[in-house]
């Protein structure tokens, strides 16, 4: 068999396309040179992927073109794609160069740019795989210009989003870029904190996400990813400021949450809003700009599980973190109390946790007589409600990471009941709590409090957003109130309005 025939056969088997012969001739020439100049083993160890990576890092255009052609073909070939992507993933310099090639402007570099554009779709796929590893996320964030280029891929014109027959490769590049950014902003620990800030500090990030939300009705998958990214970013205080400061984002999230025909889409919007409102007066003010927002949230409380859960989360955070100037308006949420109390009586896990938490916030706007009246409206009496709270504490004898604030919210509500009870009603809830063994329960809880119960949310195992008052201090206050058996208005957990 002649050398040319052999090269043609290898090119066909490697699926190197029309430029296969040129690429292979250069490969074997370099392998031969390695054998002559060094050891024969140097030439034998060479492979096409490493060879191509070396070429795209070259300063010569013809070598760069050969390299990018080889990588493009190998990375799209069914037989070699997996191994090629795995090998490329260990060399950030190659990915950086491919990204850099997109910015080349000279006419003679047009083919390189075209190959690089196709290759970058694969590059985003590589980055997505790399981002599954915590250490790699840090490397992606530190690679010069790489994060900015990933964000650049999230920019998409309204025409493309509104066109159902738009190029699949264009849509896929936006999708993969959003997937990579989502993985970066959900990275745990100090690396994640730095990445969330880096993503937020890019002036194009939030405006690009806004464009997807605003025009992506035909691309719901992209909208979901955009909202996932916003939720992850909102775990950082400075990122929240950037999101709220970008016009129209909160308004779009509210519109999607209240009007989305697709449940999952509405759920993503609700999660983003709840995270934005957590410990952020500015975010709460932005949400309250919508005139009917409280009515809409109240009507969503008894919706299906996820929608009702997120409505409660948003409403609780609005009550807890809005400025004093919104107090009068927020007091209207008391009309939702029967629905919230009903969720406490029948709910489980997260629904139960947030319903009790919302109750503690609504109680800031009522006195004990009004609260008792709301119990009646919900078809309950004092004993049934207190028995439910006692039952929750007995069920959750130890803290649970799934519902880290469960016991905190219940003890806060118990403290409010005791603080608000008057001597005129003979001790009211205090006597009832004593009768049902609350002292023994609280003493047992005091022995099992955990640092887990001092935070709002977690990024992996890393806590985010610490409560102002420790849970152990709240338990101690409740025990003191129970022992005193008298009105101690203004003391303890009932006064922790923004816990």
PLM region spans:
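Alpha-helical solenoid repeats of the armadillo/HEAT superfamily
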Residues: 23, 61-73, 106-129, 158-189, ...
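Elongated alpha-helical scaffolds that mediate protein-protein interactions in large eukaryotic proteins
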Residues: 3-47, 53-58, 62-66, 72-96, ...
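Amphipathic alpha-helical repeat scaffolds
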Residues: 37, 53-54, 99, 128, ...
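Amphipathic alpha-helical segments within extended alpha-helical solenoids and repeat-rich scaffolds
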Residues: 41-46, 52, 88-105, 117, ...
């Amino acid at each position: 068999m002649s050398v040319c025939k052999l090269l043609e056969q290898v090119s066909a088997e490697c699926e190197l396309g029309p430029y296969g012969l040129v690429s292979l001739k250069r490969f074997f020439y370099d392998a031969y040179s390695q054998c002559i100049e060094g050891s024969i083993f140097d030439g034998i160890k060479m492979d096409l992927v490493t060879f191509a990576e070396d070429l795209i890092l070259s300063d010569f255009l013809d070598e760069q073109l050969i390299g990018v052609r080889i990588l493009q073909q190998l990375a799209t070939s069914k037989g070699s794609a997996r191994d090629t992507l795995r090998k490329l993933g260990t060399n950030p310099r190659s990915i950086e160069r491919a990204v850099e090639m997109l910015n080349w402007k000279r006419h003679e570099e047009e083919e390189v740019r075209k190959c690089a554009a196709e290759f970058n779709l694969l590059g985003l796929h590589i980055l997505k795989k790399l981002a599954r590893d915590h250490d790699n996320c840090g490397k992606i964030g530190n690679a010069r210009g790489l994060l900015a280029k990933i964000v650049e891929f999230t920019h998409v014109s309204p025409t493309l989003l509104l066109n159902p027959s738009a190029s699949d490769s264009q849509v896929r590049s936006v999708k993969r870029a959003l997937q990579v950014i989502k993985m970066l902003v959900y990275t745990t620990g100090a690396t994640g904190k730095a990445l969330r800030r880096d993503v937020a500090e890019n002036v194009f990030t939030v405006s690009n996400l806004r464009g997807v939300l605003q025009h992506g009705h035909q691309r719901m998958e992209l909208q979901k990813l955009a909202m996932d990214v916003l939720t992850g970013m909102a775990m950082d205080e400075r990122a929240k400021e950037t999101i709220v400061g970008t016009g129209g984002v909160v308004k779009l999230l509210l519109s999607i949450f209240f009007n989305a025909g697709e449940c999952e889409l509405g759920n993503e919007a609700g999660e983003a809003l709840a995270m934005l409102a957590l410990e952020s007066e500015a975010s709460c003010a932005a949400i309250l700009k919508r005139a009917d927002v409280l009515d809409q949230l109240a009507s969503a409380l008894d919706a299906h599980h996820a929608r009702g859960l997120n409505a409660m989360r948003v409403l609780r955070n609005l009550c807890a973190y809005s400025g004093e100037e919104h107090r009068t308006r927020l007091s209207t949420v008391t009309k939702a109390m029967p629905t919230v109390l009903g969720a406490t009586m029948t709910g489980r896990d997260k629904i139960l946790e947030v319903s009790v938490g919302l109750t503690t916030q609504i109680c800031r706007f009522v006195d004990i007589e009004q609260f008792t009246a709301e119990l009646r409206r919900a078809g309950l009496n004092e004993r049934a409600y207190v028995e439910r709270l006692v039952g929750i504490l007995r069920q959750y004898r130890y803290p649970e990471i799934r519902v880290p604030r469960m016991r905190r919210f219940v003890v806060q509500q118990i403290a409010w009941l005791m603080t608000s009870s008057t001597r005129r009603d003979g001790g009211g809830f205090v006597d009832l709590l004593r009768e049902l063994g609350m002292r023994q329960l609280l003493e047992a809880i005091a022995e099992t409090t955990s640092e887990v119960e001092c935070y709002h949310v977690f990024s992996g195992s890393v806590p985010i957003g610490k409560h102002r008052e420790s849970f152990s201090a709240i338990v101690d206050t409740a025990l003191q109130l129970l022992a005193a058996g008298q009105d101690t208005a203004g003391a303890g957990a009932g006064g922790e309005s923004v816990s």
